Amino acid sequence: MYLCGLPALVLNRMFPRWARYSPLIGLFTVCAALFISAYARNVTELIITQGVFYGIGGAIAYMPCIMYIDEWFVKRKGLAYGIMWSGTGLAGVGLPLILEKLLEVYGYKTTMIIWAVVLFTITAPLAWYIKPRVPPLPVRRLKAFNLRFCLSRRFILYQLSNTIEAIGFYIPGIYIPIYAASVLGAEEFAQALCILLFNISSVVGCIGVGWLIDRFHVTTCVMVSTIGATLGTFLLWGCAFNMPMVFVFCVSYGLSAGSYSTTWTGVMREVAGKDMQSSSTPSSLTGGEAGDVGGGNGDNAGPPRPAESPLSEFTGSYSEEVDPIMVFVLLAAGRGFGNVISGPFSQVMYHSMPWKGEAALAYGSGYGSLIVFTGVTALGSGICFLGRRVGWC
């Protein structure tokens, strides 16, 4: 899903009038993939349905949401994105329990069919309300994206921080329940509670960081997340000798690391241009037309943009020639890349279990290397903060 953002963005920019229907198309693809996966007979078929097609459908459904929020919100854009991204954690609070109960009662096949039907029934009507601020005009062709920013020192530092954070971010969500069961003897409910606490905390964290990103520089917000995740990992998980400490770590990690992606709004602002213009113009208007619309009496009205700006066909939120949604897409790809390479590393550390019986506290439980790896990658996510201090971004 992370890696399909680029083609989804290109298609939505090429056919802006059809972009509004992308959420419905994507939702249908996602639900169809779930429905078909109920009849999967092997792992390969599961990867194709719940992996490939589910991810493609998710990207198609998700991209217009990112695009339109950028158009609808200006002053509180970070808070708007934070509230939207908090929905991921909110869904993770009750959904795992519901699916687990369905699996116990009805089995895998029936559960997948039920969930596919219920998901489409609930979300399809809501997709109608996902729309641009002003209906776009048809465009004949898509101008080339300005990708020069990819080679800028500023973007490279932000992307490096983002990818390093992603490499270790998913490890606690996978191994904390295993650690709780194998080391502390936790029951199934306590294991599930770890994930629930993380998801609930990430809801609060995303909204909080979204509020901060509208008021402070993005590197400051990144450092808040970095410090919380790093200290929480080394001090709380590293010293977790009972379940209450594990629960405290899950809350701390959800508040800090779980909200890291909300800082992308600030990165979009920094890379695409700090001077934010009016969002009251449709994404396909250019030159004088955009100026006529943007020059109204609204509070968010701004000056007309130059007719030659390639961005005039993309968004009305930024004055530079860089599409901020392209910045988002590449950051998402970096996070996806970090997630992919995290798996092999964590598997090796989990099976080798170094320092077991040799180090103190949780570091000697066999999970010490996972704890250190998670903490180091969390610390590495603050590279962009250091880069700004020395004038690199």
What are these model-derived regions, one by one?
Residues 2-19, 205-218, 236, 350:
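Helix-to-loop junctions at the C-terminal end of transmembrane segments
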Residues 13-27, 214-227, 242:
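Cytoplasmic membrane-interface "Motif A"-like loop-to-helix N-cap segments
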Residues 16, 39-41, 73-74, 185, ...:
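Helix-breaking motifs and short loop linkers at transmembrane-helix boundaries and internal kinks
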Residues 28-41, 227-241:
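C-terminal ends and interior cores of transmembrane alpha-helices
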Residues 30-37, 43-64, 68, 163-164, ...:
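Hydrophobic core of transmembrane alpha-helices in multi-pass small-molecule transporters
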Residues 51, 58-73, 80-81, 259-289, ...:
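Intracellular juxtamembrane helix-capping segments at the cytosolic ends
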Residues 76, 83-134, 165:
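Helix-loop-helix hairpin linking two adjacent transmembrane segments in secondary transporters
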Residues 152-223, 260-265, 339-351:
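Extracytoplasmic gate region of multi-pass secondary transporters
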